[in-house]
């Protein structure tokens, strides 16, 4: 299984919006990289609100919600960014690994988001 350090080595590399099987990858890329045994998500609609609710429901199915002060490496951050679902992986010291500009994996700061939910993947 990949580690958070393996994911960190991917920072700066471009990614594809869709997996080889046609399922949506987008900003889920870091989550799918770390947790390849979890189901992939195929966004059902072009409706931003429906996709946000669908993506959040899928994450809740495989994760348990935690408080921000409980965050550990590999936990998942879910937020709205420009009214769309955005997913990131917590690294450490308020840093996150996520897909952002230019379709590349980037190291960013959690304070970029005003509101977010935190999740830990169920074993």
Regions found by a protein language model. Name each.
Residues 1-62, 73, 81-85, 122:
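N-terminal capping segments
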Residues 63-66, 82-123:
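Aromatic- and glycine-rich peptidoglycan recognition patches
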């Amino acid at each position: 299984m990949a580690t958070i350090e393996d994911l960190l080595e991917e920072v700066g590399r471009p990614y594809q919006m869709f997996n080889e099987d046609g399922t949506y990858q987008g900003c889920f890329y870091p989550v799918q990289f770390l947790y390849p045994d979890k189901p992939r998500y195929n966004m059902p609609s072009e409706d931003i609100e429906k996709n946000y609710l669908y993506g959040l429901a899928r994450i809740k199915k495989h994760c348990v919600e935690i408080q921000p002060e409980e965050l550990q490496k590999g936990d998942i951050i879910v937020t709205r960014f420009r009214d769309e679902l955005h997913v990131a992986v917590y690294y450490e010291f308020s840093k996150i690994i996520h897909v952002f500009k230019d379709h590349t994996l980037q190291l960013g700061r959690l304070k970029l988001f005003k509101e977010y939910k935190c999740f830990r993947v169920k074993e």
